[in-house]
Curated annotation (Swiss-Prot):
It comes from Homo sapiens (Human). Keywords: mRNA processing, mRNA splicing, Nucleus, RNA-binding. Its main location: nucleus. GO terms for cellular component: nuclear speck; nucleoplasm. GO terms for biological process: mRNA 5'-splice site recognition; mRNA splicing, via spliceosome; negative regulation of mRNA splicing, via spliceosome; regulation of alternative mRNA splicing, via spliceosome; spliceosomal tri-snRNP complex assembly. The gene is SRSF12. This is Serine/arginine-rich splicing factor 12.
Length: 261
């Protein structure tokens, strides 16, 4: 047997052990498959209660293998236990106390890191930095692009507004022209209506004037003594004298003619 080879492990590690389980109970169950050297149920250093697992050490490896094969996944003291070969040597109570206080110290964790883990960490950190840089660059580009788009939109908006105003102004002018035309037509219709309403009055007044003028002329013909309008008193006197002389001459002629008959 070489000095570098270790003796075969004869200890079994048992999980899911009930709190009420005693070492005598485990010794009775496992002692069926061979002589047992030691049974150990670790207790909590502060509460003094079982921690839920136990160790059973046999004298022969073949006995330990038989116990593992027959009792694994079996019900012992009200629980289904799991059995496997223990890894490492049995720890002392002082080692268990330090393990409970410091289950995994950061210094041990740092020391236990392998160079490959350190390399992967450095790579992951560099990858994270590169990713952050790329994200920041993307954000800056996105901001610039959005800013340029907002600028272009702000520049294009006034042009659209001016074009919209230019396109709207002719409509307003057309509307004002239509309104002015409608107003002028209304004024013309009103003036025509007024003229039509005033024309009958004028006609009636002209008719009354013509009638009065005819009556006046008849009165002048009947009464020659009255002076018509537009003649002076001397002219009227001369005309009346001539008219009377003509009447007297015609009467004398008619009288002579009668006497001749």
């Amino acid at each position: 047997m070489s000095r570098y080879t270790r003796p075969p492990n004869t200890s079994l590690f048992i999980r899911n052990v009930a709190d009420a389980t005693r070492p005598e109970d485990l010794r009775r169950e496992f002692g069926r498959y061979g002589p047992i050297v030691d049974v150990y149920i670790p207790l909590d250093f502060y509460t003094r209660r079982p921690r839920g697992f136990a160790y059973v050490q046999f004298e022969d490896v073949r006995d330990a293998e038989d116990a593992l094969y027959n009792l694994n996944r079996k019900w012992v003291c009200g629980r289904q236990i799991e059995i496997q070969f223990a890894q490492g040597d049995r720890k002392t109570p002082g080692q268990m106390k330090s393990k409970e206080r410091h289950p995994c110290s950061p210094s041990d964790h740092r020391r236990s890191r392998s160079p490959s883990q350190r390399r992967t960490r450095s790579r992951s950190s560099s990858w994270g930095r590169n990713r952050r840089r790329s994200d920041s660059l993307k954000e800056s580009r996105h901001r610039r692009f959005s800013y340029s788009q907002s600028k272009s939109r702000s520049k294009s908006l006034p042009r659209r507004s001016t074009s919209a105003r230019q396109s709207r102004t002719p409509r307003r002018n057309f509307g004002s022209r239509g309104r002015s035309r409608s107003k002028s037509l209304q004024k013309r219709s009103k003036s025509i209506g007024k003229s039509q309403s005033s024309s009958p009055q004028k006609q009636t007044s002209s008719g009354t004037k013509s009638r009065s003028h005819g009556r006046h002329s008849d009165s002048i013909a009947r009464s020659p003594c009255k002076s018509p309008k537009g003649y002076t008193n001397s002219e009227t006197k001369v005309q009346t004298a001539k008219h009377s002389h003509f009447r007297s001459h015609s009467r004398s002629r008619s009288y002579r003619h009668k006497n001749s008959w």
